[in-house]
A protein has these predicted regions:
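An N-terminal assembly and electron-transfer interface module characteristic of large anaerobic redox
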Residues: 1-235
């Protein structure tokens, strides 16, 4: 069902993931299109990359078994917290006209999801601060290991974080330090949320002006836009 060998590995994984869900007999698959990511106030805009944003369109056109179940591939905007619950209610009502859920139910679930996301991001930053303080206290080098969210997956990162730690360095991720920077000028159009984090993490390292603090950017799967991000991060 994969239409192109040039699709990145995470995109290819989605085919198997959806097939596995269908094999388990689920009555619906929720995989929405998301043009925008959350606005972290670091860039000129806050798009998702085209694969993240629109791959549900590819999935719905290439996995024939989806025709036999409910596929929720509608366009949603998680960045619009104020009207997301209403939009989500309309989508769910369209797919499940006889569902017993109410607008209040969807609002409650949405609020809980946003609260959990905010809690998670605060935890990531707090742990980052903890390990930065540890490195300062023990005079250890710091590596900001910067990449995309999928690099957290052990299947993809192959334990490079542990390898760096075994070399005596303290590792933190780009989303643990990017928040320490304000929006700043870049040489390229800074319009993707994940890229904005990369650039902010690189600036954080430069602003520290400490030779013990360095950045490693992980680049995988021949991602086309990383031809741009790598030059900007290096610059």
């Amino acid at each position: 069902t994969i239409p192109s060998d040039t699709a990145c590995f995470p995109a290819k994984l989605m085919h198997g993931h959806v097939e596995a869900l269908l094999d388990e007999g689920v009555d619906a698959v929720f995989y929405p299109c998301m043009t925008y990511n959350f606005d972290e106030n670091l860039g000129d805009n806050h798009y998702n990359c085209p694969v993240v944003a629109y791959y549900p369109e590819v999935i719905s056109s290439n996995i024939q078994k989806l025709k036999d179940t409910v596929f929720i591939g509608d366009y949603v905007g998680l960045h619009r917290r104020h009207d997301f619950p209403g939009k989500m209610y309309e989508i769910l009502r369209r797919h499940f006209p006889n569902g017993t859920f109410t607008k209040k139910d969807v609002k409650k679930a949405s609020d809980a999801a946003y609260a959990e996301y905010d809690l998670y991001m605060r935890a990531v930053r707090a742990i980052g601060d903890k390990f930065l303080a540890l490195a300062e206290e023990q005079h250890k080098p710091v590596i900001v290991l910067a990449g995309r969210p999928y690099h957290v997956d052990p299947e993809i990162n192959h334990g490079i974080d542990s390898l760096i730690c075994d070399c005596g360095a303290v590792v933190v991720t780009e989303d643990a330090v990017a928040c320490k920077e304000k929006k700043f000028p870049t040489k390229v159009l800074n319009q993707w949320t994940y890229h904005s984090r990369l650039y902010a993490a690189a600036k954080y390292v430069v602003d520290r002006a400490d030779k013990r603090v360095n950045l490693i950017q992980l680049v995988s799967f021949g991602c086309g836009v990383d031809a741009i991000t790598t030059d900007e991060v290096r610059g």
